[in-house]
Amino acid sequence: MATYKVTLINEEEGINAILEVADDQTILDAGEEAGLDLPSSCRAGSCSTCAGKLVSGAAPNQDDQAFLDDDQLAAGWVMTCVAYPTGDCTIMTHQESEVL
């Protein structure tokens, strides 16, 4: 099992946290375990509540998501509830209004 540094940021929400996330743990779960107040609803990758935006680093594996289309995935949108890290990365949280 590999572990990666996942940085979650959102200036408006006061979030700037560096997490150690195992490759078998979702980014949302890791953030919640660290005490962050992150948005979520379905926890299955089929809504937009947990949407984030990849700012830098390795794109997470989110094969289980059903909301984003190929163009949105290519643009760096992330469903944190089903996103597993594949390398160090930085993700801006609370982006539901931007992805819609």
UniProtKB/Swiss-Prot annotation:
Described purpose of this protein according to its UniProt entry: Ferredoxins are iron-sulfur proteins that transfer electrons in a wide variety of metabolic reactions.
InterPro entries with a match to the protein in the record: 2Fe-2S_ferredoxin-like_sf (IPR036010), 2Fe-2S_ferredoxin-type (IPR001041), 2Fe2S_fd_BS (IPR006058), Beta-grasp_dom_sf (IPR012675), Fd_pln (IPR010241)
PANTHER family: FERREDOXIN, FERREDOXIN-2, CHLOROPLASTIC
Stated family: Belongs to the 2Fe2S plant-type ferredoxin family.
Source organism per UniProt: Aphanothece sacrum
GO molecular function, one term: metal ion binding
Residue sites binding [2Fe-2S] cluster per the record: 42, 47, 50, 81
Keyword check for Iron-sulfur: yes
Pfam families, per database record: Fer2 (PF00111)
Cofactor(s) needed: [2Fe-2S] cluster
A Gene Ontology biological process term: electron transport chain
Free-text cofactor note: Binds 1 [2Fe-2S] cluster.
Stored PROSITE patterns: 2FE2S_FER_1, 2FE2S_FER_2
NCBIfam families the UniProt entry points to: fdx_plant (TIGR02008)
Record-given protein name: Ferredoxin-2
Domain of life: Bacteria
Iron-sulfur listed as a keyword: yes
Keywords linked to the UniProt accession: 2Fe-2S, Electron transport, Iron, Iron-sulfur, Metal-binding, Transport
All copies of domain 2Fe-2S ferredoxin-type, residue ranges: 4-97
